[in-house]
């Protein structure tokens, strides 16, 4: 599940609004995120060029691009039709408006940095990016570092949007493949379901409480935000099964949306 992490030191340095309060009041939106990110970017070495050595409002790995903004806005590339099959859902005016605004926003490379995983992670724990968008599991990588950070759900598009919606990155999933020539689908399905239920009953809660809340997160507010994150997320068939790689190529989405 993708989410935001924010740097508390930079938040305090630039006297920015409390993001936890914004989330609770339903005011944590794409525009608010961009406003805060813009205030926190800086050319640290004064060479009039923004490079990996400078400070940014938000950093993300280049293989992900702006997808979290899109899903957080409540949009998807595919929807399920009346026959239970996926079909494109790109035709709405809202989709076009969101796409254009996200494209124009993240094209500001003085504020938004896209790069290799290790670069954006280092940028965050060295306190050179206010926001960092990654999968939840990545928060564990910050344990060796002293950076004071908190968790946030993906931003809503507007305050009028009812819920905060999280994006499940299909590249981080481990699907179960069942052979087409399987002669006992019912038995196989029963076993797979049993394993899934056992994982939920015996693994999810201990991981949630012992690892995340007990060792990774650094304040009670992040635990509150985590509850929001894990209780409302979406999958997109186009991302999950690669039905429309021409439009939704994960590795090239950032390049597509900024060109």
What role is predicted for each listed range?
Residues 20, 43-54:
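Acidic, glycine-anchored loop motifs typical of Ca2+
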Residues 34-39, 117-132:
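Short helices/loops that flank or line small-molecule/ion binding pockets
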Residues 62, 133-139:
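Beta->alpha turn/N-cap motifs
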Residues 34-39, 68-116:
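Glycine-centered hinge/linker elements that transmit conformational signals in sensory
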Residues 1-21, 59-83, 170-179:
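Periplasmic solute-binding protein
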Residues 143-212:
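Extracytoplasmic/periplasmic substrate-recognition and gating elements
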């Amino acid at each position: 599940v993708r989410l935001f992490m924010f740097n508390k030191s930079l938040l305090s340095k630039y006297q920015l609004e409390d993001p936890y309060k914004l989330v609770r009041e339903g005011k944590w939106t794409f525009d608010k995120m961009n406003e805060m990110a813009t205030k926190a970017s800086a050319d640290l070495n004064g060479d009039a060029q923004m490079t990996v050595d400078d400070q940014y409002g938000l950093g993300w790995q280049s293989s992900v691009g702006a997808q979290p903004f899109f899903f957080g806005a409540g949009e998807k590339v595919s929807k399920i039709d009346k026959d239970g099959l996926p079909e494109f859902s790109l035709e709405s005016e809202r989709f076009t408006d969101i796409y254009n605004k996200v494209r124009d926003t993240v094209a500001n490379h003085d504020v938004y940095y896209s790069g290799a995983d290790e670069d954006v992670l280092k940028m965050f724990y060295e306190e050179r990016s206010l926001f960092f968008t990654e999968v939840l599991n990545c928060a564990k990588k910050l344990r060796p570092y002293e950076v004071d950070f908190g968790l946030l759900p993906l931003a809503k598009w507007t305050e009028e949007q009812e819920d905060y919606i999280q994006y499940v990155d299909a590249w981080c999933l481990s699907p179960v493949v069942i052979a087409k020539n399987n002669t006992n689908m019912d038995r196989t399905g029963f076993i797979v379901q049993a394993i899934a239920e056992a994982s939920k009953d015996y693994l999810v809660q201990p991981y949630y409480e012992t690892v995340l809340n007990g060792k990774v997160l650094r304040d009670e507010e992040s635990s509150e935000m985590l509850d929001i994150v894990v209780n409302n997320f979406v999958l997109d068939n186009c991302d999950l099964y690669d039905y429309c790689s021409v439009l939704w190529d994960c590795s090239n989405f950032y390049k597509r949306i900024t060109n």
